[in-house]
């Protein structure tokens, strides 16, 4: 159900055959498309423990604190021989040319230094690929883009998540901005509602999630 520019199953199989597990991935694109889930799946394929860090785990109010936390994260993963995952890593790898404070530069420098020397695999996920420092891109073995699900994937997901066929009155154009995360959310809503939910009601909830992603319509005329 993942729409990516790389065959993720084949990628995992090829990585399993590597004599040395020193590689890095940047998984980027639409929110809710399964980037973090794939990173954890990859760890299971490699039979490796996971060390997962969010920016909130690492950012510090003290001078030099964030840099120390970044170094500690890599050290922890190294000690455990774990797959290190940075979730929403854009805050740690933001383009230094846009920095306005010195610590915004030093924390990126620390990330780049650690990425260069780390002997074990690591994965960064981001919804904001364009904001990453260009030097960071050279440190990723693979950069994998995640997009909205294809129409065929949406139809399969409806059957998989809800054990029902999708309503026949839905056109392909109606299904252009859905992700696995949307299906998970609607599945949770349906479970909370308790009573059996019809395909039409489920589809209505999915389309509402899709609508929430669209930018607000711009008004035309004079104020």
What function would you assign to each model-found segment?
Residues 2-169:
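Walker A/P-loop NTP-binding motif of AAA+ ATPase domains
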């Amino acid at each position: 159900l993942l729409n990516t520019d790389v065959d993720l199953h084949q990628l995992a199989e090829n990585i399993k055959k590597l004599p040395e597990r020193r590689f890095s991935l940047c998984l980027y694109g639409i929110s809710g498309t399964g980037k973090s889930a794939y990173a954890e799946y990859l760890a299971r394929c490699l039979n490796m423990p996971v060390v997962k860090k969010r920016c909130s785990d690492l950012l510090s109010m003290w001078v030099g604190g964030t840099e120390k936390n970044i170094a500690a994260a890599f050290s922890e993963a190294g000690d455990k021989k774990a797959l290190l995952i940075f979730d929403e890593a854009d805050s740690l790898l933001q383009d230094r040319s846009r920095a306005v404070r010195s610590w915004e530069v030093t924390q990126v420098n620390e990330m780049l230094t650690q990425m260069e020397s780390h002997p074990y695999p690591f994965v960064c996920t981001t919804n904001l690929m364009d904001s990453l420092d260009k030097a960071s891109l050279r440190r990723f073995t693979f950069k994998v883009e995640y997009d909205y699900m294809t129409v065929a994937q949406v139809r399969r997901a409806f059957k998989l998540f809800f054990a029902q066929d999708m309503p026949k009155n839905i056109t392909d154009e109606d299904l252009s901005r859905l992700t696995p995360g949307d299906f998970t959310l609607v599945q949770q809503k349906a479970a909370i509602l308790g009573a059996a939910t019809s395909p039409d009601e489920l589809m209505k909830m999915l389309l509402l999630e899709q609508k929430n992603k669209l930018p607000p319509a711009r008004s035309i005329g004079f104020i």
